[in-house]
Amino acid sequence: MPDLSAGPVLLRSHRLDDVDDMVLACRDEQTWTWTTVPKPYEPEHAESYVNRTVGTPIDGETRWAIEVDGRFSGNIGVMLEGEARRVGEAAPVGLGRADVGYFVAPWARGRGVGTLALWLVCDWAFRKGGCEVVTWNALVGNVPSRRMVEKVGFHIHADPARRMVVQRGERVDVWTADLLPEDLVPLDTLLP
């Protein structure tokens, strides 16, 4: 799994020294409200996550830690589907899809960190993952996440997908959006 970087953002493998900041981030009310992380979020959750994800794609999903100024500042991952799972091989055009998901720690919000991380992962999915389309889903009402995907070039679907995601045992509605390679905005338009 390659490191990816732009501006102040570094995407890298998770490390055990991320655990304390991961716990802080996942105990944040906004993170809990808009994601499916367990509540309460304990150090064991973070340790298990890090141990499962260090450096290797899992079931087609590649996950990175978001780092800013040497500090863990969130998670981002892309789930490659179909032919796109053959990372490193030339996947046939038109067969690759991916879903992207992320959260940004409270201390990194409002600085464009999530937008840059999202751009890096989408660019990687198109160039290296064999993807022709990247899809995003977020719980209806998660306006900051919606703004991020719009800045990167995603097109929001008109109607929410009804009860598409399970969050802590309840089915909830989500916004959905898709990004094609030609829709990805130039990186320099996002840099500080």
Labelled PLM ranges:
Residues R52-T53, W124:
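A generic secondary-structure signal
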Residues V54-D59:
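Short loop/turn motifs at secondary-structure junctions and domain boundaries
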Residues M1-Q30, R63-P192:
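Acyl-donor (CoA/ACP) binding surface of acyl/acetyltransferases
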Residues W34-K39, G60-I66:
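A short, aromatic/hydrophobic, helix- or strand-capping loop or linear motif
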Residues Q30-R52:
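Conserved GNAT-fold acetyl-CoA-binding loop/helix
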